Amino acid sequence: MVELTLATLLGTVAGDFCELRNEGRPVLESVLLAYSKANDQYGGKNVRNVISGSFGLEAQAISFVVTKCPDKL
């Protein structure tokens, strides 16, 4: 199994977040659903490990979303 990286996780979550926002869902609902999908895809323990070991997570997450769908934040 390939090790989950922060870049992979954020890319997945940002893509799902943008899709959900395009459907008209609120920001918080979109974040929670995208995170939930990542847990399903990569496993909750893997997601938690990547998040807990990350530096500057908030800034990196925002930059992924702004790159993928700048009008959705």
Give each language-model segment a name.
Residues 1-3, 70-71:
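N-terminal secretory-pathway/extracellular module detecting exported/lumenal segments
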